[in-house]
């Protein structure tokens, strides 16, 4: 399934509603090579799972300069990826000593069984935050070393609770996982937590980003700043709409609206119904939850109907 982990995280999102948009978006993506040496220490192998939400496919990264190297993420479990890994290691006379998983989504963990099948010693070399049985934990600030590469783990929840990023100290670079993509923006589980994570990643001061999907990010700080600005703009847009609604209501009447009514104000009433129900409403709900955490909005439930209103 081409959507990979995004299908898992966005269970309410019917991707068919965005087919035209996504096909157009995908046609504009730069082509990435199946196997490409990105730097003296970083080799990228594409997961062969290109799709609407996985972009050109999941990027898996072989890191180090010596015979024994580590790999970050394992794609989705397609045999074509496993074959590419086998060819890559054989042609370069190198082996894998560690497997790091950025998070639990299937387009990042699906290749683990193939790696263990091909290289049985890796059964004791799988590392993940909130590990499954038989895996080793990854903690904030933990350091891992192979020849030519020092990796520092950074916990970055928001896209998923267990998400880890990895700083490559020798290059002042970061493997950003799904927190920062090479193109577009990532889906999130919890917007406020995700924005905190973006600020935390920005504070690492890394120059280059190696994302789990899409091309290398040459200016990671700029990319993160742009992402934060977009999210902040959505919040302001939502608050402004609630403010307009309050001004239009009679004095003394609580200006509370449903998510659907708020979307009418922000996006208009001519939005495709499927897009509204399957995408805009869940996203607006997440923005409102974040604003509620910030103490800027609140909600009430009357007769089973939740309505939202501004506090400021």
UniProtKB/Swiss-Prot annotation:
Use of this protein: Secalonic acids show unprecedented anticancer activities against various human cancer cells and might be interesting for further derivatization, targeting diseases such as cancer.
Function: Atrochrysone carboxyl ACP thioesterase; part of the gene cluster that mediates the biosynthesis of the tetrahydroxanthone dimer secalonic acid D. The pathway begins with the synthesis of atrochrysone thioester by the polyketide synthase AacuL. The atrochrysone carboxyl ACP thioesterase AacuM then breaks the thioester bond and releases the atrochrysone carboxylic acid from AacuL. Atrochrysone carboxylic acid is decarboxylated by the decarboxylase AacuI, and oxidized by the anthrone oxygenase AacuG to yield emodin.
Record-listed Zn(2+) 1 binding positions: 103, 105
Name of the protein in question: Atrochrysone carboxyl ACP thioesterase AacuM
Keywords: Hydrolase, Metal-binding, Zinc
One Pfam family recorded for the sequence: Lactamase_B
GO-annotated molecular function: hydrolase activity; metal ion binding
